[in-house]
Amino acid sequence: REDSPSGLFTRDMLTQLDAVFQRMAAPLVLKLYLDDTALSAELETYMTQLCALTEKLTLVKEESMDTEVADIQERPCVRICREDGSWTGLAFHGVPGGHEFTSFVLGLYNAAGPGQTLDEETLRRVRSLPAVKMQILVSLSCTMCPELVTAAQRIAAENPLVTAEVYDLNHFPRLRERY
């Protein structure tokens, strides 16, 4: 198999992505919330190329600049949604590249099902958690962040009261300064 035409995905990445897509139990919709920045254009290109690799992913650009939903104020953003358009609780603000690409793909797998295996006790505890909105601030060069992101997304995929929103700190200095 050749590299993707855009050069975004290597042959090895395409093989690994194909294996994940084949195991996904349900289709997903990736909703993009963009602005007029170069970063938004990069996210749109990245997600367009990713969705072109499988029929299990559909891309939707949300044109509205409505900021009723707090996280949409921080653009660009991709929300992982179910086929009916309802939000799974997983979102990435920025472009999920670098070390975060794998955790983003695992988030897709966990949201679509069957997801990474959890033992019964862990599953029971995750499902009993109260409402929590996790905001995870990462650096794409961080080697420790993907494990935290994957765990948070796994919890959010399993519990409808939990959300896991990941932010690339390089592009959201207000959050970096605040926390």
Which residues are covered by each model-predicted region?
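Non-catalytic, surface beta->alpha helical segment in thiol-disulfide oxidoreductase systems
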Residues: 80-115
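Auxiliary Fe-S-binding modules of radical SAM enzymes
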Residues: 1-4, 8-9, 178
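Long, contiguous hydrophobic alpha-helical segments, chiefly transmembrane helices and signal peptides
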Residues: 78, 92-94, 148-152
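Feature detects long, helix-prone N-terminal segments enriched in hydrophobes
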Residues: 5, 21, 65, 124-126, ...
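Thioredoxin-like thiol-disulfide oxidoreductase module
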Residues: 48-84, 161-179
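Local sequence-structure signature of Cys/Sec-based thiol-disulfide redox active-site neighborhoods
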Residues: 7-49, 53, 127-164
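Long, charged amphipathic helices and adjacent flexible linkers at domain junctions
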Residues: 114-129
